[in-house]
Amino acid sequence: MSKLKEYRVNRQIRAKECRLIDENGQQIGIVPIEEALKIAEEKGLDLVEIAPQAKPPVCKIMDYGKFKYELKKKEREARKKQREHQIEVKDIRMKVRIDEHDLQVKLKHMREFLEEGDKVKVWLRFRGRENIYPELGKKLAERIINELSDIAEVEVQPKKEGNFMIFVLAPKRKK
């Protein structure tokens, strides 16, 4: 689940010397690792190897537990933001001969989805003899598109596929 980078801490650091940064972010300079460990120990903090690939490696004096907590917190925030921006495609299915009130309920749901920023995929179902009257579906699709034209634009034009007429509405982009 967590993709946190593992840092070497205190005695795990294998370099002979390091570029030391104190807990306030001030650069102390290049010091032997033993001296850096001693300074960190005196302050009651940990010595953490931040950039092991650098020559000499960069080490920082800090509270490692707090550092890990902050990293996890940032990762959670990033995941949360990513989830917020995901656009879902919501499916709405209805028959071609839908009753007026039922259509209004479906339109209300579509409007809610579009206002939340989701796309809506509309499936108009043809049953039996309705298949020979595709104009019924076209008429209903046009009506739905017109009703939602203030907040939605057609992303995929109505197209008959088998027993369904399918089209996709996307929220209008804000200018």
Swiss-Prot record:
Q: Name one GO cellular component term.
A: cytosol
Instruction: Please give the chief subcellular localization of this protein.
Output: cytoplasm
Which GO molecular-function terms appear in the entry?
ribosome binding; translation initiation factor activity
Instruction: List the Pfam families hit by this protein, alphabetically.
Output: IF3_C, IF3_N
Q: What InterPro entries does the record tag this protein with?
A: T_IF-3_C_sf (IPR036788), T_IF-3_N_sf (IPR036787), Translation_initiation_fac3_CS (IPR019813), Translation_initiation_fac_3 (IPR001288), Translation_initiation_fac_3_C (IPR019815), Translation_initiation_fac_3_N (IPR019814)
Record's subcellular location: Cytoplasm
Question: Which UniProt keywords are listed?
Answer: Cytoplasm, Initiation factor, Protein biosynthesis
The record's Gene Ontology biological-process terms are: ribosome disassembly
Cite the record's note on assembly.
Monomer.
Give the protein family: Belongs to the IF-3 family.
Described function: IF-3 binds to the 30S ribosomal subunit and shifts the equilibrium between 70S ribosomes and their 50S and 30S subunits in favor of the free subunits, thus enhancing the availability of 30S subunits on which protein synthesis initiation begins.
Give the protein's recorded name.
Translation initiation factor IF-3
Origin organism of this chain? Aquifex aeolicus (strain VF5)
Gene from which the chain derives: infC
